[in-house]
């Protein structure tokens, strides 16, 4: 098995995905939100790239069956039901609902890799579950970091490093240099990831906007034992497909 990591979704094309599993990471916050929503009982999440696309898609659903959710520039979209804060996705709001979801980085990354044979979602909240899934599949795997506004982001590459660390204890594999670098960046800080993530632009911006509790939540390791999976444009837990 070979593990390859891309620092943003902008640097990948369909040829890179052929016959490979893909893990999309957007720890702050899209893949953390989707993982939380599904764990808390959401029926499914439909990621879309644009706000207008989300609104148009919602017209196909009865109003009591869906939620419009997401952000632009880290802020809730006007007229939407939920923002991009995982703390909002509690069972009493999301259970049984279809969530139509659009974000600046994460949902666009998911759309970019949708042609891959298998796409799963990773974050710190489910890092061990993701590593086990990769190990059992025993297929070449591409980790795609969503990044922030098309640029490298600490939170995603450190999560890639956490997956690498968990995978090391499960199976033998080869990897590219960025996968190794993500591991060596992660390892000294594995017990306090905030100590390095605090230097990242994205985390600092979220703090400035008042999302400190979101950050604490998203930096929790192995809170959930589920693996969200994208298939035919819809994300459900892997066992639901």
Curated annotation (Swiss-Prot):
Keywords: Hydrolase, Magnesium. The keyword Signal does not apply. GO terms for molecular function: 2-phosphosulfolactate phosphatase activity; magnesium ion binding; sulfopyruvate decarboxylase activity. It catalyses: (2R)-O-phospho-3-sulfolactate + H2O = (2R)-3-sulfolactate + phosphate. Pfam families: 2-ph_phosp (PF04029). Its EC number is 3.1.3.71. Belongs to the ComB family. PANTHER family: 2-PHOSPHOSULFOLACTATE PHOSPHATASE-RELATED. This is Probable 2-phosphosulfolactate phosphatase. It comes from Caldanaerobacter subterraneus subsp. tengcongensis (strain DSM 15242 / JCM 11007 / NBRC 100824 / MB4).
